[in-house]
């Protein structure tokens, strides 16, 4: 099937993407002190030069004391980190690409001993999980407002250094998603209980980001059913419930939904072939990004279990068919782009035989 659908421009207000190929956010941990360096700049520049229309950066921590959970991940606060990101922006723009930061708070995933302040524990919606296990500092309402303010400031900073929008990380069992999920949200106030109440934190956060950046500055929201704490978890079981969950987020100011799945080809609900991005587009009318093992014959978790496994390039025929049918608008590519910065150009040129396979070793280097 012709690949031209991947390489058509995409327009959303003032945002113009040269192609439908999106670089998925992937934690890389190559920014000592939280500052993106020359290797990080070149890493992103190479993808833009080879035909990636939109780069969503690796997760970048907002300016809250408990936002970070891992060593050497980049910050999105402070003079040095923002100056580093400005260099990344300029390099990507010079190649004709667009770029947004993924704004991130890890929540209860954080552990005592983590930089930058080792004394700070993880923060979560409530100190106990559904099974009663005490895991974190349960957030007060003041804590909630502090985190919301940190996201709003990060978005404003992104706009000021020339980023083309922002993505809010609301997926995979990190803080925003911890509020969504009843397994981690045991609050009894207006931020807990029903899914509508558990969504209140995200809604207020999105509203604050929108107020900080004004109209016309794109806000992408990434969400998932699955959690790193439970890969079988599901926030909703039916299309109706999905629509009820997403509409308030859309109304709060989301422009594009990034629908995270482990395998893009899997139907989200019985009775339809639509995946999560397809249903989200149908229910909200907003553009969507699909993601999940694009371009490879094996999903990510297999490489955590079997370190010798190699994922070979896979056919894009089913992906292109869905894209041509307007099931979704944009396609996020993760590991295939991580290992091969020229992936998009090779696909465009019909050089599939030259695409590099993925192995776990690729995670250890920045190319």
What are these regions (language model features)?
Residues 1-367:
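Flavin-dependent oxidoreductase catalytic cores
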